Amino acid sequence: MFGDTANKLILDAKRSSNLSAIPIYQSDLVKSIVRETNDLNKDAEYLVEEQEQLQETQDQENSKINQCQLFVTHLSMRRNKRCLLAYEKSRADKITEFCWLNIDPIETSTSSSTTSTNTNSNVNQSSSNNAVNPLTKNLSNYTTSLDMNNLNHHEQDFFKQYQDLIMEFKSSFEDIDLSGDLNPPTNIFIDVRVLKDGGEVTTEYGSFNLIKDSQFFVRKSDVERLIQQGYLEEII
């Protein structure tokens, strides 16, 4: 039935919106929808020609039937187009989310048993590299990992060009942290919980190991990068 394939694509986009990673591009579904839309377009052209013939013969009854068929065909084509655009837009939004993080997409696609992080160096790099979008508050489904192999060719080009735009934009305001939080911090020190294992973290006040489910009372500025990258969550 027309529209079933597009519905599957939208369901995939809905599931992907709750993930912290971008899943593989559904090229087969997209191609099927494009083929279906082309077939519908051929049907629409045939119905238009038939409508012209019916008008010449003044067959009112069949003309109304033809008009209904043509109307439904156009609606199906428009729905397929909307579903395709919604799918592409949802993936583009997640790609732009990831672009604001200072994470290498190739490294995030490979598993590592230990991760060594120095937050002091991350803070220094944040003024010249990408950081999390300041408008994003809920990081539970924020895009924190990206496998370039899951993107199609056009998405890979979009990712690289968007990164270049961010770097060019931020280079004009070197003295301003454009990626900083728009709301002032309520507390200097916060309680955090470790969400996944990592390596040793060195801060100005000492070191601690990222062990899943462990909790720490740390200075917020020292662990902001780890929160953005999905290693920690703030306990409120």
From Swiss-Prot:
| Record's keyword annotation contains Metal-binding | no
- BP GO annotations: DNA strand elongation involved in mitotic DNA replication; double-strand break repair via break-induced replication; mitotic DNA replication initiation
Gene3D superfamilies, per this entry? 1.20.58.1030
**Annotated region described as Disordered, given as residue ranges:** 109-134
Keyword Nucleus attributed? yes
| Listed InterPro entries | GINS_A, GINS_bundle-like_dom_sf, GINS_Psf1, PSF1_C
Comp. bias (Low complexity): 109-130
Q: Which Pfam families match?
A: PSF1_C, Sld5
Q: Name one GO cellular component term.
A: CMG complex
Which terms are listed as keywords in the entry?
Answer: DNA replication, Nucleus
Q: Which CDD domains match?
A: GINS_A_psf1, GINS_B_Psf1
- Compartment annotation: Nucleus
Outline what the protein does.
Answer: The GINS complex plays an essential role in the initiation of DNA replication.
Member of which family? Belongs to the GINS1/PSF1 family.
Q: Fill in the subunit field for this protein.
A: Component of the GINS complex which is a heterotetramer of SLD5, PSF1, PSF2 and PSF3.
Put simply, this protein is called: DNA replication complex GINS protein PSF1
